[in-house]
Swiss-Prot record:
Ribosomal protein recorded as keyword: yes
Family annotation (Pfam families): Ribosomal_L17
UniProt name for this protein: Large ribosomal subunit protein bL17
GO biological process: translation
GO molecular-function terms, A-Z: structural constituent of ribosome
Assigned keywords, A-Z: Ribonucleoprotein, Ribosomal protein
Annotated PANTHER family: LARGE RIBOSOMAL SUBUNIT PROTEIN BL17M (PTHR14413:SF16), RIBOSOMAL PROTEIN L17 (PTHR14413)
Family per record: Belongs to the bacterial ribosomal protein bL17 family.
InterPro entries: Ribosomal_bL17, Ribosomal_bL17_CS, Ribosomal_bL17_sf
Taxonomic source organism: Lysinibacillus sphaericus (strain C3-41)
Length: 126
């Protein structure tokens, strides 16, 4: 299976993909370069599939990849709840895609970045 090097060492690349995947799960929409988005899509699709499985082994596999970041959500009544990104993945994100067989993300092109002309995209959960 091929992958993009993204101009980084393997440990730097893995850390960046973990950060981007965690941010995408928390915010459900991030802006990044096209190459990074295509790589993070692979990781997030695997994490959502693990979330759909929902067993202990899947939770531990996802916990090894997803960062332990706090997520603050507000419900319709204005009550704030705090949980971890992993909990949001298993309790909120994955159940939305119970009937869907893959294709959990969408990549929309934004245009070139002003500084270096790199193609910028928005990756979001469908």
């Amino acid at each position: 299976m091929g992958y993009r090097k993204l101009g980084r060492t393997s440990s730097q690349r893995k850390a960046m993909l973990r950060d981007l995947a965690t941010d995408l799960i928390i915010n459900e929409r991030i802006e990044t370069t096209e190459a990074r988005a295509k790589e993070v899509r692979k990781a997030v699709e695997k994490m959502i599939t693990l979330g759909k499985r929902g067993d202990l082994h899947a939770r531990r596999q996802a916990a090894a990849f997803i960062r332990r970041e706090l997520v603050t959500t507000t419900d319709a009544e204005g009550n704030e709840t705090t949980s971890f990104a992993l909990q949001k993945l298993f309790d909120d994100v994955a159940p939305r895609y119970a009937e869907r067989q893959g294709g959990y993300t969408r990549i929309l092109k934004v245009g070139p970045r002003r500084g270096d002309g790199a193609p910028v995209v928005v990756i979001e959960l469908v």
